[in-house]
């Protein structure tokens, strides 16, 4: 699995992926994980947005983002997933009200197996490394910031062929 995500160039053919629908499908699949901790999902999206990509890898990216948000959110919290068309890109944002990631660690959390030493949650340290690898494979960018709730907001920008 790790090797699959660490390839710099993808040999698999990319095709149009209905990103809005894919995110809705993944949120529905991960709903039991969230409801077990009384966490609410909120999805805000423009109309269907298509990007050129590899569906299976995008599933991995979406699942890692949402699973991390659920893991670090307080019980009874809310996770906001937002998808918008931006300047020549499709922008995916996942925000939670968890502890966030200190600014000084934000670049390092993309390294494989790196974990915030102050975190008590268990994990492999691969989630955000996979997110970054898949984002790069799709010629995108990923950025971490503080959410409005004080947790983490992960922003992924994908090139949108509709604007190319």
Report each predicted region and the residues it spans.
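Short helix-loop "hinge" at the ATP-lid/N-box region of the Bergerat-fold HATPase_c
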Residues: 69-70
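Conserved micro-motifs of the catalytic ATP-binding
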Residues: 7-13, 50-53
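Short beta-strand/loop element within the Bergerat-fold HATPase_c
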Residues: 76-88
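Short conserved segment of the HATPase_c
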Residues: 101-113
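A conserved beta-strand-to-alpha-helix junction within the catalytic ATP-binding
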Residues: 13-28, 42
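Conserved catalytic submotifs in the C-terminal HATPase_c
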Residues: 15-16, 35-36, 40-49, 56
């Amino acid at each position: 699995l790790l090797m699959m995500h660490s390839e710099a160039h993808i040999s698999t053919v990319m095709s149009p992926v209905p990103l809005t629908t894919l995110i809705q499908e993944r949120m529905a699949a991960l709903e039991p994980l969230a409801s077990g901790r009384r966490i609410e999902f909120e999805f805000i999206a423009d109309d269907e947005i298509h990007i050129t990509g590899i569906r299976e890898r995008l599933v991995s990216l979406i699942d890692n983002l949402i699973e991390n948000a659920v893991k670090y959110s307080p019980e009874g919290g809310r996770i906001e997933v937002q998808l918008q068309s931006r300047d020549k890109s499709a922008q995916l944002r996942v925000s939670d009200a968890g502890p966030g990631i200190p600014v000084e660690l934000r670049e390092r959390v993309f390294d494989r197996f790196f974990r915030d030493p102050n975190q008590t949650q268990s994990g492999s340290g691969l989630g955000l490394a996979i997110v970054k690898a898949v984002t790069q494979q799709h010629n995108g960018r990923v950025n971490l910031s503080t959410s409005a709730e004080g947790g983490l907001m992960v922003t992924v920008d994908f090139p949108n062929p509709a604007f190319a």
